[in-house]
Amino acid sequence: EINYIWSSHEHPDHFSTGTLKSIDENIRSKITVLYQSTKDKKVINFCKGLGFKTQELPNKKNIMLNDDFNLICGKSGFYDSWLYLTDKYNTLLNINDCHIDTLKDLEKINKDLGNEKIDILLSQFSYAAWRGNKNDSLLREQEAKNKIRILERQLENIKPKYFIPFASYI
């Protein structure tokens, strides 16, 4: 049973209109789409138009979904967002595609979350966009090494119990 769907941002590899449309119309009204607050409300209005319940997530505000389940959604860059989930047993932080790369960025997100211990971290394990032509192997290798350095910095500073490499099979 699906109760909630969250999308980090509007790009089609994260927010799939086809997938949402493929969900049976009879159960859409039982599912709440969670999405960061935006000025244009385009995603929220689209989902409402399909018959989903919707809930906008204000930036960095704790939202209690039920007695045992909370979340915080934070904006990252111009259009992306991260998601922090807690229940009475675990904490999970999804920072996939977010530019949380520097020590300063990591200190800020730790502060935003009250320096809570993260049990599970989801983060991108490789670069996700075009990095040179076929013959630019050195550039792609440098980008991959840079992404690994960023990932190491994230793991050293967030110190999750578990890490789930996420997305980006380039």
Regions found by a protein language model. Give the residues of each.
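Active-site environment of divalent metal-dependent phosphoester hydrolases
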Residues: 10-15, 39-43, 62-64, 78-80, ...
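Active-site HxH/HxHxD metal-binding segment of metal-dependent hydrolases
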Residues: 1-59
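Short linear motifs at secondary-structure transitions and domain/linker junctions
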Residues: 7-10, 29, 47-50, 58-62, ...
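Short amphipathic alpha-helical segments and helix-helix/interface helices
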Residues: 17-25, 43-44, 82, 106-111, ...
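Cap/insert and terminal regions of metallo-dependent hydrolase folds
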Residues: 34-35, 103-170
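Low-complexity, flexible helical/coil segments
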Residues: 2-5, 40-47, 66-73, 129-134, ...
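Glycine-centered loop/turn positions within well-structured domains
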Residues: 13, 90, 161
